[in-house]
C-alpha cells in the first residue's frame, strides 16, 4: 500500500444517494480474488447501454470526467453487502478518494484497509460541491490527510474526520497486518517480560 499524504486531482460527481455495493460492482464480478481488472465492472449497469456500448449520459463517461481521481457522491455511499470488491473496483478504476456526506460502515472500513480514502463532509458542503462541479466540470480538489482538510476551489478549507489508527496506516502506507509486523519486537519483548504460567496437572 502506497503512503498517502495529499491527494490532488480532478473530481467527478455522481449525485445519487444510497448507492449500494451491488450498484458499485454487480455480484457476477465477485468470483475473482485478484483486484486487477475489476474496473471493468464498476457501475456496470449504469456505465453501459443494453447493447454494451458506453452510456454517454453517465457522469463517468463524459469527456470532462477523464482522469478523475476523486469521486463525489451522495449520502450512505457503499450500503448493502460487505463485498470488499466494491472499494477494489473504485481503486482499480483510478479513484484515490470518495467524498460523501456519509458512508456505510463496512464499506468505509474496507476502503481504509486498501488505501482508498473515504472523506465524510457535511451535507451542506456536499451540496456546494455539486453546484461547483456543475459550474466547472474541470474542478480540482486537494485533500490533505495529515491536516484532515479538503481545500475547496473558493479557498475555504473543510475538516473531515478519520480515526487515528487508520490515519497512521494511510500516512505510512501500511495495512493492519503491516502495522502488526512493525510491532513484532515490542510484542516479543512483552511476552518475554510476562511469561505464561506453567500448566501443571494436580494428581488426586
UniProtKB/Swiss-Prot annotation:
GO terms for cellular component: 3-isopropylmalate dehydratase complex. The keyword Amino-acid biosynthesis applies. It holds the Pfam family Aconitase_C. GO terms for biological process: L-leucine biosynthetic process. One of its GO terms (molecular function) is 3-isopropylmalate dehydratase activity. Transmembrane segments: none annotated. The keyword ATP-binding does not apply. Keywords: Amino-acid biosynthesis, Branched-chain amino acid biosynthesis, Leucine biosynthesis, Lyase. Pathway: Amino-acid biosynthesis; L-leucine biosynthesis; L-leucine from 3-methyl-2-oxobutanoate: step 2/4. Its EC number is 4.2.1.33. It catalyses: (2R,3S)-3-isopropylmalate = (2S)-2-isopropylmalate. It is an enzyme of class 4 (lyase). Belongs to the LeuD family. LeuD type 1 subfamily. Catalyzes the isomerization between 2-isopropylmalate and 3-isopropylmalate, via the formation of 2-isopropylmaleate. HAMAP family: LeuD_type1 (MF_01031). Heterodimer of LeuC and LeuD. PANTHER family: 3-ISOPROPYLMALATE DEHYDRATASE SMALL SUBUNIT, 3-ISOPROPYLMALATE DEHYDRATASE SMALL SUBUNIT 2-RELATED-RELATED. This is 3-isopropylmalate dehydratase small subunit. It comes from Chloroflexus aggregans (strain MD-66 / DSM 9485). The lineage of its organism: Bacteria, Bacillati, Chloroflexota, Chloroflexia, Chloroflexales.
